From Swiss-Prot:
Belongs to the UPF0398 family. It holds the Pfam family YpsA. It comes from Pediococcus pentosaceus (strain ATCC 25745 / CCUG 21536 / LMG 10740 / 183-1w). HAMAP family: UPF0398. InterPro entries: YspA. Gene3D superfamilies: 3.40.50.450. This is UPF0398 protein PEPE_0933. Disulfide bonds: none annotated.
Length: 183
């Protein structure tokens, strides 16, 4: 059993505000390609948080992949119990759909948001309950995911933990493949 933590840019950090944005198709193709590679090399669990963007896209893709890879399971982990309560209704509904399709759901903290320590506890939980991580992230273009990457790098100092990134160069390559396929 191998468990993969997937995280990365939030949708707004990539200026993606619609499911019809052409950038999203390229990102989804890159994520799907990497998820398939991971599943075919032994990953049995895809585990992500509820953030808009990479985390939700990854769970949607992983849930689709379960048709071809029935051994694959998905988990959605909330850092605290009232995550997303301030979101617009359509975003809350989309998260509820994802939550309904995953194989496992839990809150790392059963309390509503109280302080940033809950987010660090979430990172520690993810690191201690996964074997490796996949990040949609580019060090040259910082975003909130830098906090997860820093936690991973710190964890790696004392633990064997692999991290792979899909960066903007990878997305550029994926974009060229996508354009070739479209022609």
């Amino acid at each position: 059993m191998s468990r993969l933590w997937v995280t990365g840019y939030r949708s707004y950090e990539l200026s993606i505000f619609s499911d019809q944005d052409p950038k999203l198709k390229v990102i989804q193709n890159a994520l799907k390609r990497k998820l398939i590679e991971k599943v075919e090399s032994g990953t049995t669990w895809i585990i992500a948080g509820p953030q808009l963007g990479t985390e939700q896209w990854s769970l949607e893709l992983a849930n689709e992949l379960k048709m071809d890879y029935p051994e694959l399971q998905t988990a959605l982990m909330f850092p605290f119990s009232d995550f997303g309560k301030q979101w617009k209704e359509e975003k809350v509904e989309k998260l509820a759909l994802i939550k309904a399709k995953v194989d496992f759901f839990a809150n790392v903290s059963e309390n509503p948001y109280q302080n940033p320590q809950q987010l660090r506890n979430y990172q520690n939980f993810m690191l201690n309950h996964t074997d490796e991580a996949l990040l949609l992230y580019d060090d040259e273009h910082e975003g909130k995911t830098k906090f997860d990457l820093n936690a991973i790098r710190s964890f790696q100092e004392h633990n064997s933990y692999n991290v792979e990134t899909i960066d903007f160069y990878d997305l550029e390559e994926e974009s060229m493949l996508y354009e070739e396929k479209d022609e």
